[in-house]
Structure formats: C-alpha cells, structure tokens
Amino acid sequence: MVRFFGLNKKKNEEKENTDLPADNEQNAAETSSSNVSGNEERIDPNSHDANPENANNDDASTTFGSSIQSSSIFSRGRMTYGTGASSSMATSEMRSHSSGHSGSKNSKNLQGFKDVGKPLRAVSFLNPVKEEESQDTQNTLDVSSSTSSTLATSGNARENSFTSRRSITLEYIHKSLSELEENLVDIMDDIHQDVISISKAVIEAIEYFKEFLPTTRDRIPYRISLEKSSSLRKINKIVLHFLDNLLVSDAFSNSRSILLRRFYFFLKKLNLITDDDLISESGVLPCLSVFCIGSHCNLPSMDKLGMILDELTKMDSSIISDQEGAFIAPILRGITPKSSILTIMFGLPNLQHEHYEMIKVLYSLFPDVHMYCVKDYIKKAASAVGSIPSHTAATIDTIAPTKFQFSPPYAVSENPLELPISMSLSTETSAKITGTLGGYLFPQTGSDKKFSQFASCSFAITCAHVVLSEKQDYPNVMVPSNVLQTSYKKVLTKESDRYPDGSVEKTAFLEEVQRIDQNLNWQKSNKFGQVVWGERAIVDHRLSDFAIIKVNSSFKCQNTLGNGLKSFPDPTLRFQNLHVKRKIFKMKPGMKVFKIGASTGYTSGELNSTKLVYWADGKLQSSEFVVASPTPLFASAGDSGAWILTKLEDRLGLGLVGMLHSYDGEQRQFGLFTPIGDILERLHAVTKIQWDIDPQLDG
C-alpha cells in the first residue's frame, strides 16, 4: 500500500489483495501482472500470465532477475551485479541457479542472507532480465539489448493496462465501492468515538481513495448513478462531512485541499464529472457548491425530508425560539449537480461550537443525507443605504448632458414618464430604505360600477417593508430612488472638494450635482404615485410582504424591462423577450429564472423543489426560494420587490413567477420570493377585485 507520511490502518492490509499506487497507471499495470489475486484475476482472464507453467515462477523470477541488471545509484557503473539472494521469496532451486551462474565471491558470501537490502532500481515486472553475471565488458555489451527489452516491456504493460480496464466488470466496481464505503464508515465511527484524530483519519481516507480501482487511472466504461448506488451516496456524505464539518479550521486547509482533489478524481473515474462540466483541469482545485433540488432529482429520502420540513412549519412558534434569521435549507451539495447528494444546510447568524456538535448528533439521522452549518441568515432585501450600490446604468436626459458623461449607480429611463420595471424605488421622505419596483398590476373591475373609478388605473407593486412607514400612512413614492440619488449627490460633492476651484474636474462634478438636483425637483413636481395598501404579516405560515402604489395618470405603465437597460449577460433578452406576457402559476422544480434588482442587476438561478424554513419576527416561516446558478450570487440589499422572471418556452416573452422579498445575508446565494399566485389571491381577498399584469380591455 502507498503510505502517506507512513500512516495507515492495519486492517486495510488485511482487506486489500493488492498493493498498488492509484496515481501511476504504468506501475499499476506492471504490478498487476505479477501480484494480482482473487477478484482481479477474475476481472482480467486474458492476462499475460495465462500460461500456468510460466505463472508459477513469474513472481520469484521477476524479483530475482531484476536485481541482476538494473540501473542503480549505488553501483560504480550503470549496471548492478547480482547478489545471489534477490528476495526472501526466492526458492532454493532459484538460489542454486544463481550460484551456478555467478563466479563472484560477493555472491557466494551473500547467498545465506534472506533480508539483504537492495539498491533502488527501475525494473520491468512483465519481462524480467534473466540473471547473467559476467565481466564488466559483457555487461556493457548487454546494455543495448536490455534497454530494448525494457522499452518493449513498457509497451506491453500499457497495452495490458488498457485490456485490464476494458475487462473490469460492473459487479467488481460495485464491490469496490462497497469496500471503500466500509473503510470510510469505520474511519467516521472512530472519529465520533474519539478513537482516532481527525488528522490521521483524513490521511487514511485519502489512502483509501488512492487504492480505489488502482488499475484504472482514467474513466471506467460504465456510468454509475447516485440514485442506484447507496454505497456511492454514503461515500459522498462522508467526504462532505469531512470537508464541511470536520476540516473547517484553517489548520486543516492543506488536508482539505488534498481530500477534495482526491475526491474529484474519484468522481471523474466514475463518470460523475464530465469534460463538459465547468471544472477545469488546469491545476485549479475544484470546489463544493450548492444546487437546487430539481424535478429530475430522484434521490431516496427526498420525500421524507420534505415531509419533515412541512411538519416543522406547522409547529407552534410559541414553543420554539432561535436566532433571528436562522434557517434550514434543503438543497443539493457537491462538485457538480450530477455528483451532488441531498443536503440540509443550517444557517445561523452566530455560529458556535455547539452547533457543530449538534451536527454530529444528527449525522446518523439519514444514511445518505449530508448536514452542515454555516454562518448565514435570512434578511429583508431592502437596502439601508450606507454606500452607493455598484450597479450602474445610462443617465437620464432631463437636462442637457454634460461633456463628461457620468453613470449613476441606479437605473434610469430614457423617458421619465415611461418607467420600465426593475428600477430603484423609495418613499419621498426616506433617508435610508430603498428597494426595487417589481412591476405593474391592473384591476379587472368588469362592469361593476362600484369599482369603476379604478377601471383605468395602474398600480405598481413592491415589498411592503420598503415603502410602509410608521410616520406616514400613505407615503408618496419616487422612481428612481430618492435615497440613491441623494447618496450619489453627496459622493460627487465630496469628491469635487478635492479639486481646485475653476478646474475642469470640479466643474464637471458640480454640473452633475446640479443635474441630480434638477431631476429630484422634477420628481417632486411630477409625483410617481402613492401607497394605497400594504402589509407585512404571516398568513398561513407564509410571509405576505407587498404593497400596491397607485400610479399618477400621467405615467405610462407597461410591464417591460425597457430598452434603456443594456447590461444583460443574456443576449436573448431583446425585443419581445423584454415584455412580461404571462403569469406562471405552476412552478417546476429546477426551472431557470432570473431577476433584475436595483442593487445587483441581472442574476439568475433555479427554483428549488422544497421550501426553506426560517425564523423571523418571532415566528417560524417558510418560503419558496431560488438557488443562484451558475454564479453564487442571486440577491442583495436593495433588491426587495424585484420580480422573479423566466423566459417562456412556447412563445416569445417573459413569464412572471413571483416577487423577491428576502435573501441570505451572508452568502447571498438564496433568493426568497412570494409566488405571483399567492400575491393575486391575497389582493383579491383584501380588495374584492381581480388583478392581472395586463390592463383591462374595454368592453
């Protein structure tokens, strides 16, 4: 067995039939020809040792003969000379054969010793050099023929390695996975019982991965699935437990990297990581990521996990207490989606050692479900502005532009009376809180005269925590955000003070400040709208957090992203694909969605099949959520109210899935949203009017 710093388990020596390094294909192929036994012989019946007569003495003759002519750093010349006692495995007949051919005194003196150390040498086990000891001149003449023999042997070894890989059976692979699982389970039991240190345990785990299918360096000719292999799921769980829970300290960073890299090659060998995956082989270490539980996920325990979380949300909040924002997120975790397993992520704003101890207690709850805890929490996606957000867009032309073009850190419209969706928004008097204009809703009053006054009205929608105020019942709203414009103005004014009076730079900054002032004054004279209703409450264990804003009749309201928003990574978001044309009531797990927030702009993700459970406002709540993909960012402060959208498959245009209200504040990879169906249902219950994303047709 290949040893890592000389540490390994004794029981591994008893279980393994071969002692092969997994990182060297040629050595593995050469060693397998002389040392294979048990299962490996059954896998490769066409091995070069098929001749019984030759096979009987192959081991001994190879070891014996290889010491006679080989390259050595201890000999005076390029070739070494036989000792007559090549190995303790040599038979008495072979030793007498050696004595008959050797005329040196040293050979006779060393014949009686069985454990004489041998010099380092490069040998071929498939075609051993026969023992021929003669004068130095004869050895010199034999160098050419010996080299040719070694080259031919290397080619045969490589060919036999490919033959052995082709002959590996699926039964043998599953047996090897089962053995690896047993070894790793034993290690984990020893860790939890404090029998072995984590440092030694991870070294042994790495060694076990090295010895998995040692004769196969590349991919196996089969495809192993996590759904059908319980051993593979358990192996994944143990490795993730190492990486996420046991090796989180900086002291284990090197061990963590080695184990992760070894695990990567293990998955690649099983075809769970393909060349099409985003993991490069340029020396950059792979990393663990989170993925959504999609509609194609058929892993065992998924239904049971969903039932547990559903029951948890029904519990009485009065008997539960936790840190504000703490959450439980059911997800997939691994290197790639195809190689990931079911995972329960515990997010806690104040992570302590006792939480890791809790994970150890829960470790055996599910045999193939990974659990880990991170410093993270759920928070509202409104922004309490302390600095300017990084998202930039084109400038608004309310006055003549300056010769120096500035790009404010918020989206603006080419026409101030035609405001597209997803722009920044705040109340007129707000000094800190800012969010995103989700879109527009239109009441469907029909022929009911009681609601005829609302028939031609347009209403904007955003999160209630963005615009509701205790100081004012029906505040006026500004788009773009008054908070962002005021903050941007302060930054420019402060920067202008660094330049001398009359300089070109200071003049440019002051002109931009003047332009912002004029735009703010225009917005106050041409009010966008006023909040008429909103609520932030728990209804049926679900958060209802939205408000509707009656828009001034001088504004033209359309559910479109607008042509002024140009920073889209998706090139297909053009023309008809800029317009929201349908409501999506039936959400498919794994559906690809995106949002355009006032803070982070365009980000994409996938819908998770199971809801996230979190503790907020003294109550246990649940919510649908999006897992960021392919980048690990989905939402941040200032994105509250942004619509969750998807591209329609059967026609051009966008579908409305829901509205963002929260995100995980530390890692920002989850976006919590309210489905559009729930929003419209709640609005109908409150107003007694049907609502839609399209204006009511006359007649």
From Swiss-Prot:
GO terms for cellular component: plasma membrane. Induction: Down-regulated after extracellular amino-acid addition. Residues 52-78, 97-109, 144-154 have a biased composition (Low complexity). InterPro entries: Peptidase_S1_PA, Peptidase_S64_Ssy5. It comes from the Eukaryota. Residues 1-381 form a propeptide. Keywords: Cell membrane, Membrane, Zymogen. Residues 24-38, 83-93 have a biased composition (Polar residues). Residues 39-51 have a biased composition (Basic and acidic residues). The keyword Magnesium does not apply. It is found in: Cell membrane. The keyword Cell membrane applies. It is a peripheral membrane protein. Residues 459-699 are annotated as: Serine protease. The active site is at H465 (charge relay system), D545 (charge relay system), S640 (charge relay system). Residues 1-113, 129-158 are annotated as: Disordered. Protease component of the SPS-sensor system, which regulates the expression of several amino acid-metabolizing enzymes and amino acid- and peptide-permeases in response to extracellular amino acid levels by controlling the activity of two transcription factors, STP1 and STP2. Catalyzes the activation of these transcription factors, which are synthesized as latent cytoplasmic precursors, by proteolytic removal of an N-terminal inhibitory domain containing cytoplasmic retention motifs. SSY5 binds as an inactive protease complex to STP1. Component of the plasma membrane SPS (SSY1-PTR3-SSY5) amino acid sensor complex. This is SPS-sensor serine protease component SSY5. It comes from Saccharomyces cerevisiae (strain YJM789) (Baker's yeast).
